[in-house]
């Protein structure tokens, strides 16, 4: 065989290998065409409108005009709204519109989406795949899981098949259909990057992390597996630019349907509650407790009238398991307890003084269980802020303060947490009103305006602090 013949044969072998490799790769890539054709009719576009009071602020050198657009880009549309309105400031009504996605879960018109898509909306319109546009009623919304249920007046609507989010595996292919930037029925795909992901202030949801391209307008839309089953609701992204950066998060459909069923049947969502203040177990704390590695949730304080204190848990206990399920980190405990129906017993494995022991606790109901659309009894209680308080006991007063209530628990998804209030703080005053008791606090909260923030004075670690508190709209 000549040298040229050998080179020709080698070139042909390499070409065949490359073609075979490309063919094998093409066979492995999924085809989403059938999935999209079957699922698209049940995916909807959601548009909302709400009227807000804006204000022309005397903002420094801008002489009473609105905040310039360049600053709105960096600080957000509501930056000016967070500031108290000074004397002479003028306001006006303005209609704001937003877009999102959703999907039909029943033939008689129930639709699932994100709570943040419809939050504060005066009007909700749903655009169907067949071109119809229908007004929707908000059946209920749960801000802790970011799930909302809508209802349109229609029959014989197409629906989607729901999958099982418990069977998900990292690396499997998934696809999303939604309306990014209003471009309805856009399809994107990717893989599951991680499961059971906990995000700050979203402790009740074990998120599905994907690399599917999700952008504003995709929120509330379905995430599918290759069988065309809905396994999640696309909810949020991690971004530094305002757009997709490869980190997208979806609410598992099992979690979403549990919430949706409660909203449809009961008008509210019940969650288990222990009445404890917890903190992470650091490596140093783990060493001090004689643990092999950091894990579990350390109980730092208890509500003396709560289920945990009543049934024998103590400050300093490290909760390691809930009914046999490992508590990998402190953020896992609220999620595990939250899925237990109030009134049911759970067996907790705890570490106390270097010894493991089991403690049975009858789970209570979270003080601020979310109510359905329109609100219900309890909306004006301290729970409306997402916190629980108790009176100051003897010895808890300080020379610097002579009134207030102690914050014993803060819901990480509530308005109090967003304002910077922590468990252990003493809430001294709201606006110009001193807080004397939990009962009086309830009255003050019931009188708070929803159109502006109010100053709240806190006492923490020997110092006074002020935070701006804005109520979530009912």
Curated annotation (Swiss-Prot):
Domain PDZ span(s) in chain numbering: 263-354, 360-462
Primary residence: periplasm
CDD domains: cpPDZ1_DegP-like (cd10839)
Subcellular location as annotated: Periplasm
Identification of the protein by name: Probable periplasmic serine endoprotease DegP-like
One example GO MF annotation: serine-type endopeptidase activity
Signal sequence bounds: 1-26
Binding site for substrate: 217-219, 274-278
SUPFAM superfamilies: PDZ domain-like, Trypsin-like serine proteases
Active site annotation, chain numbering: 116 (charge relay system), 146 (charge relay system), 219 (charge relay system)
Short name of any one Pfam family annotated for the protein: PDZ_2
Organism domain of life: Bacteria
EC number in record: 3.4.21.107
